[in-house]
Structure formats: structure tokens, C-alpha cells
Amino acid sequence: MTELSTSPAPSSGSSTPAGSAVQPVRRGRRLLLSLVAVVVVAGLGFGAFALAFPAQVPDPIGEAVGNLTGANPHPVTLTRLPVAPLSAVALLGKQLFFDPKLSASGQQSCASCHSPAHAYGPPNDLDAQLGGTSMALQGYRPPPSLMYLYRQPNFMIGPDQGENDDAPSVAQLAASSAGVVKAQKTAGAAPPAAPQMVPQGGLFWDGRVDTLQQQAFGPLLNPVEMANTSIDTVAQKLENAPYSKQFTQLFGPRIFSDKQLTVSEAMFAIARYQVEDPSFHPYNSKYDRWLEGKERLSQAELRGLHLFNDPNKANCAGCHLSKPGSDGLPPMFTDYQYEALGVPRNRALAQNRDPKFFDLGVCGPFRQDLKDQTQYCAMFLTPTLRNSATRQVFFHNGVYHTLDQVMSFYNDRNTNPGKFYPKGADGKVDKYDDIPAKYQKNVDVTDAPFDRNFGDKPAMTDQEMRDIIAFVHTLNDDPPPTH
């Protein structure tokens, strides 16, 4: 008798090995890991691309990368003057620029006060340069830089009169603006809809001349500078100079028969040299390269740039415009306007030994056409900040000699005036001591950081001021070739 089994018979095809059940799970994990790896690699690749080319990624990412790396997420192409060989007139102007024999002392040339090695500004830290017949007389103001002056507009007050053939005189424009409240100047803000009548443009600290030719002529007869006694004296020196033959070649054989014309053509030649020689306007600073996406700023420089443009902090860009124009011209770091800042009186200046003497800028004493327009008294031209970190003397009276001092004055003038001004006989701080009391209302107290009161917290910390100074150093051009 056959014994029957009680074990169930296996079903064909229904049996699975024990380890084979986890294989799909493993394959899924491998696929997931592969996808993660692809995402990571793609992310790293995109991150590397963003770091290298922040301008090629979406704005929020580019801004973040720029803040992290110091790159410019929005590079631009700057428009510069074409570089070409100097004309014959400019080459003559170059010789004139460096010729000390054109001065009464025989020791002072244009380059003595406008040194090429110092951004065509003063070569030392003197409050004002020495000149005169024996080079012992102190000047009235420190020389501004001659760089980038080819873009300086003519002096005017208020909006341009356009094609009006009967445009009012400067004095008439000034008189019509009397009593008009000066607009607040804020970094990055659009100008007010109604045009403001403000002085702007011109050369020298008070804008008293408009052309480089006029500017070059100014020191020739100034008794504390080149100190020549007359135009005839200068013309005679030009006729006796080793380059006199170039005058006759360029301006005709009778050029020396008219003394006024001789000197005028000489000053024109100096002006052409300043316009044509690229060392006067190279636009090759670190900031220019950063604007074009060719260089990166350090973290301190980048923080300084943000503070420079911050209307609630330094607000520097309210007057020292930092962005390129729509035409691609590099920023000039000035709005060409005039401000009354109330810097302390410099008692080291010879002219200030007279307690009744006040240098009032636009309304005198060196220009007289606006002396009755008292709303402009104590206003001086806003200079470009390009190459300012190479200077050793600041403001119209040379009272400060470092950027640290300048920043401290801006930051603490109103919150701690005793830090800068002396005390009067009554024991009170003599604020704005270089401006007569009747003109002190012209001093800027509305634009940051001057919009603080005594005892308020200053707009900037010490570290923030150091960062701004670090940024200002990026505005220095590369040194020009040695003359």
C-alpha cells in the first residue's frame, strides 16, 4: 500500500530565492544616489559658473555671488578717449608744462604744484604750496588735481539755458535764486522735478574760470605763485626759450610781435597737452576695472562701496556720483556743484593771520562777480574723488592731511563739534569758525551724514569709515610713465 505525502506540492514558477527580494530596493537606491550625484555635480558646476561669471546668472544669484566674491554682477563697457600720438601743439604744451623758467623765481613750473607722480596734484603735504620770486610766499589754497578736467562743465547757476540767445548773466541767475531752499542730496535718488538754482562747474576752488587755457594762465601773474610782473615778461621768456622756433612753426613768423597772442597761444598749447595726453585721464583704476568685470574688490572695499552709496550712512554718492552714465562715460565722482561744509579755519595759512579775512569761495575774495550773492558765500567746488587717496592735503584751506581726518570730520562734525572747532571767549564751541556768522546758514545740515544733532549717534562706525577709505583707494589710477 502506497503511503500518501501530506506536504503540499510546490507550484511551478512560484518559488523566489530569499535574497532576490531586496534587489529592486538596491537598484532604486543606486538610481537615487545617481540622481543625487548628478544634481550635486550640476549644482557644483552651476556654482562654479556663477562664481566665474556672475553676470551670466539671474540677478539675485549674481548679486549674492558678487557680495561673496567681490565681482561685479553687472559689468559695463566704459567709453574712453582714443589714444593717439600727441599733436605738435600738445608736444609744445608739454614742454611749457615742465618749464620752471616761465616763473619769476626760475624754479616753479606747472608740474611743481601739479606733479604727474601725484595725480597732477601737490607733491607734498604743505597746507598751500610755496611760490613767489624767492619761493618763500605761501599760496592761498592747495592746488586741485588737473586730472579729468577735460570733462569739467563751464560755471553756471541753475539749469542750462539751452539755445536762448539772450541767456541771463550769472549774476542775474544768482539773484533770481535768492531765497530758494537748496535741495537735499541723497545717494541714488532722482533729482527733484523742479530745477534747483545751484552753482556748478568751472575751474579753481571757486569756479572763476571755465577753460583749461584760462586756468593755465592764472598762476603766471599770481604774486604767490609764478609771480611774473606782466604778460610782456612772460612773452619775452617764451621768445627766448629753446622751443621758440616751434612757436613760429605752429603760429606763424609774427607770433612774437603780439605779446598777448604769444601768451594766449602758449596757454592753448598747455591746454591741448592736458586734453590729449592720456595720463591726465586714464580711467585705469581698480574701480574702473571692477566696473568692466575685469577685477574683484576685497570684502573691505566692497563694504566701503555699499556704505559710499548708502543714503543713510556715508551718502558720499550724493555729491560724488559713483555710477557710469548712460553714454558709457566712467563716473567722475563729482556732481560739479558747490557746497558749504564749514571746515575749521586753518590758522597755519598766512592770510588767516588777519582775523577779519575769510575765504568765502564763490562770493570772494578771488572772484568778484558774485560777491553780492550771499546765499553762495563759503561754498566751494566739489572735487572728484578719483586719486584722492594719493593726496596729502584736503579741502580748500588744506586744514586736513589724511582721509582718516576727512572721514572723522564728516562723521562727527555735528554730533561732536568740539572735536574740530576751538572754544570762544565764552567757553562755547566756535562752530564753523571759518565762516562769518551771517553766512553760516549756508552750511549743509540736511544731507547725511550732516543731518545729525549734537550728542546723536554718528552715521558711521570706525570700521565703516575704514571700509570707505579702503574703497576710495580703488579710485587711484595706475601711476603714469616717468616724465
Descriptions of predicted regions:
Residues T384-H483:
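Extracellular low-complexity, Gly/Ser/Thr-rich intrinsically disordered linkers
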Residues F53-Q213, P282-K423, H483:
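Short glycine/threonine-rich turn/loop motifs
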Residues S5, L32-V36, G342, A350, ...:
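Compositionally biased amphipathic helical and low-complexity segments enriched in hydrophobic
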Residues T2-L96, G218-P223, A227-L302, H306, ...:
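Post-cleavage N-terminal segment of exported redox proteins
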